[in-house]
């Protein structure tokens, strides 16, 4: 990172789960220029086709890059990362970092060799994830649970609403009786944001692993190898694709996470 200027990094997700990845990166690299975009008009991505996700993600990243030249993009969404990375890397000359379920570290730390992958419905069914399991967790029994409801619960928490523990427990019910399940992969960036609540529902689980710290280290490594293109002292900004009813409450949320302004992207323009 041979530049007096701070790099501009875009974090992208369909919702606000990417805050968990952004948090780890900002702790490691506090002085970067951070942009965050959540495509709430298209939320959740787990319910969309692969082609829709690819076209939507590419269009939004291009639009932001035209106004705020980017040095690095983090796709802070496991579902999107399983399908969009080749298209983004083909279009952008800058590094694009994806979010991969932490199957390998989970398999390494599990003592019972019985692990669970908690992710979105879209992520658990991808061939990419099956390949990760085959490569890194061949000696493990791997339970897979795909949930849209947990994503919604995490979003509600970020909007300042109480977590519905009854609904959370119901969603995790298939795993509550598996006593030798000792490690859970939080395979959606939303889930670290409700990790304590998930722990309460699964008391037998000893280890919860996610990709946040590994992504932060990857970002640091990549930035050390590139020349910074953006020359800006802009404040940290957050983008959405449609405004919502509790916008006033959400302004408090974005300031808490270190962003100065919420901007609505007009994707029809």
Swiss-Prot record:
One MF term in the entry's GO annotations: glutamate racemase activity
Source organism (scientific name): Pasteurella multocida (strain Pm70)
One Pfam family here: Asp_Glu_race
EC number: 5.1.1.3
Family of the protein in this entry: Belongs to the aspartate/glutamate racemases family.
HAMAP family: Glu_racemase
Physiological role: Provides the (R)-glutamate required for cell wall biosynthesis.
GO process terms (BP): cell wall organization; peptidoglycan biosynthetic process; regulation of cell shape
PROSITE patterns recorded: ASP_GLU_RACEMASE_1, ASP_GLU_RACEMASE_2
Keyword field: Cell shape, Cell wall biogenesis/degradation, Isomerase, Peptidoglycan synthesis
Reaction(s) the record says it catalyses: L-glutamate = D-glutamate
Full protein name: Glutamate racemase
Gene3D superfamilies, per database record: 3.40.50.1860
Pathway: Cell wall biogenesis; peptidoglycan biosynthesis
Protein origin, superkingdom: Bacteria
């Amino acid at each position: 990172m041979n530049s007096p200027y701070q790099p501009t990094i875009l974090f992208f997700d369909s919702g606000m789960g990417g805050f968990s990845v952004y948090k780890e990166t900002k702790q490691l690299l506090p002085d970067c220029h951070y942009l965050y975009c959540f495509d709430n008009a298209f939320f959740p991505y787990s319910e969309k086709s692969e082609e829709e996700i690819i076209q939507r993600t590419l269009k939004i990243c291009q639009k932001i890059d035209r106004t705020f030249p980017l040095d690095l993009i983090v796709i802070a969404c496991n579902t999107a990362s399983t399908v969009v990375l080749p298209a983004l890397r083909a279009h952008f000359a800058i590094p694009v970092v994806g979010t991969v379920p932490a199957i390998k570290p989970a398999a390494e730390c599990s003592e019972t060799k019985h692990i669970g992958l908690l992710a979105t419905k879209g992520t658990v069914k991808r061939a990419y994830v099956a390949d990760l399991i085959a490569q890194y967790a061949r000696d493990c029994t791997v339970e897979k649970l795909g949930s849209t409801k947990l994503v919604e619960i995490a979003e509600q928490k970020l909007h300042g609403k109480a977590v519905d523990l009854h609904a959370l427990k119901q969603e995790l019910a298939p795993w509550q009786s598996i006593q030798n399940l000792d490690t859970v992969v939080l395979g959606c960036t939303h889930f670290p944001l409700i990790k304590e609540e998930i722990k309460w529902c699964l008391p037998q689980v000893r280890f919860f692993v996610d990709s946040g710290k590994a992504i932060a280290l990857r970002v640091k490594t990549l930035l050390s190898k590139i020349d910074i293109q953006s020359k800006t002292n802009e404040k940290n900004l957050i983008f959405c694709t449609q405004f919502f009813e509790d916008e006033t409450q959400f302004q408090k949320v974005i300031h808490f996470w270190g962003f100065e302004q919420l901007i609505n992207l007009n994707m029809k323009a």
